[in-house]
Amino acid sequence: MVSAASNIDVSNESIIKMEGVDVVFGRNRVLRRIDLNLAQGETLAIIGESGCGKTVLLKTIIGLLHPTRGSVYFDGRDLGRMSEKELNGQRIRFGFLFQQAALFDSMTVAQNIGFSLRQHTNKRAEEIREIVSARVAEVGLPENVLGKKPAELSGGMRKRVGLARALALEPEIMLYDEPTTGLDPIMSDVINELIINTRRQHPVTSIVVTHDMRTARKVADRVIMLFPLSRLKSGEPQIIYDGPAERIDDAADSRVSQFIRGEARERLMEMRRINGR
Amino acid sequence: MRGGPVGAMVDWVADWISDFGAVLLDWTASLGSIAIFVMRTFRWLLGRLPKKETLTPNFYEIGVLSLPVVALTGTFIGMVLVVQSYVQFRNMNIEAKLGAVINMSLVRELGPVLAATMLAGRVGSAMAAELGTMRVTEQIDALITMGANPIHYLVVPRFLACLLLIPSLTIMADFMGVAGAFFYAVYLLDIDMYHYLENSRHFVGGFDLFVGLFKSLFFGAAIALIACYRGFNCEPGAEGVGKAATAAFVHSFVVILVLDLLLGIALDGIYYTIWPEAPKLL
């Protein structure tokens, strides 16, 4: 199978599998019976409106949140059955770009990017410096940012440093949480290009959580759309679209076309109906 | 909703029982959560020590940077004690005994409690705010995704720094308090130096110093655990961080005072078991 977004081979082997995953916080159910398969080398975009559970899904995949019911398998192994040590061992096979980059405030850019290398490898300081410089160049940042603290950087720069940090250990899976949120259109496109380049340079499987259709179309092979549980009828599946990125415009479900066209009128009417106005 | 005054009373009692039950459940859940947090900290502490580059900044921040403020407050507490006690002692013509009472109070009680209070105020609330901010801005999640355990990386170094350095801070508070009291009593109030020192030497022993230092270890551990727990369980937003910092100080201070009382009673018991002939205070 060849990826539509980047002409890269996608294996048919599943690397991440979710089976009947429910996530409940107190009385608030966020995810219901999620079944998902991700093939090795594939880039999946998860779209949906704010609050539908996209980030929760991403955090469940890496074991930051635990499913209330169901299982998440990574490479055929159930994350729920792993000890904390085993889970940490698996996590270093992932790279995670957080929505606000989540850089460590107390460290410089160089220390942030080199953090995993210092924690999990026996590389000498000189080797770590070289890798850090290479990663910074890869995300298109100048060398002089290395000594700066995250607070001194712009939003776009922070995202790129976050990406460089996530790539430091050459992960097998990259998880992007709203990579273009809060950025101007040009910087958003820079980040999209970086996601595509990352895939070209490293053989990674990626999941991109976004509500930016431009990003989803540009970087993903496949798109799934989540729908908020509060607006679903009982028994309706939460994933209302699962298919190739280039065919999302032809989706039969009107809720998908409403979302991708950014149509607010029907949503506003629904909100008014719910609020009794 | 029932009608009549009896019905209203029944409703009020039912509400009260329900609210009380909810508070009790919350407290039990919090206690369980704190216990798990403490156990995980000790498990990591006994399992693998953090790297030197993680420990050093915490030791510097918590120990070295706290020294000046502890020294300053210690000096003033010593002098204030002399000012407050002098008139009463002079009225009884026993002002030369002032050294014994003040130094005993400083070494056994005020030195460790003062050092711990300053640590809780200066370091505890800052730790809670820092970790709270890290929680809110997903930095703790980032640590986890990078395969680092946040308890091992963030809590254990702070716990070790508080535990191992609070005795030094207590010694500093003791020393500066004793020196401040001596200076005020001897040079400003003209109390006879020989008798002041002789009474101090006679009444204050090694066990008193040990009591103060031993208690301080518990205070340091409590401050670090409470502050880190509050930071880790911070509510979202700037308000959550502020609340975590305040709660860290208030809870630490209450726990310091409770521990002070309990340890004071226990250590007195040990003292009179070892030396049954020693004169009793009461």
Features from the language model and the residues they span:
Chain A
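Helix-to-loop junction immediately C-terminal to a conserved catalytic motif
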Residues: I62
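Conserved ABC transporter NBD signature motif
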Residues: G70-D78
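Conserved ABC ATPase "signature" region
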Residues: R77-D78, A125-N144
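Short coil-to-helix segment of the ABC ATPase nucleotide-binding domain corresponding to the Q-loop/switch region
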Residues: S106-F115
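Conserved ABC ATPase signature
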Residues: K149-L153, M157
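Conserved catalytic motifs of ABC-family nucleotide-binding domains
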Residues: E170
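Catalytic Walker B motif of ABC-type/P-loop ATPase nucleotide-binding domains
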Residues: M174-D177
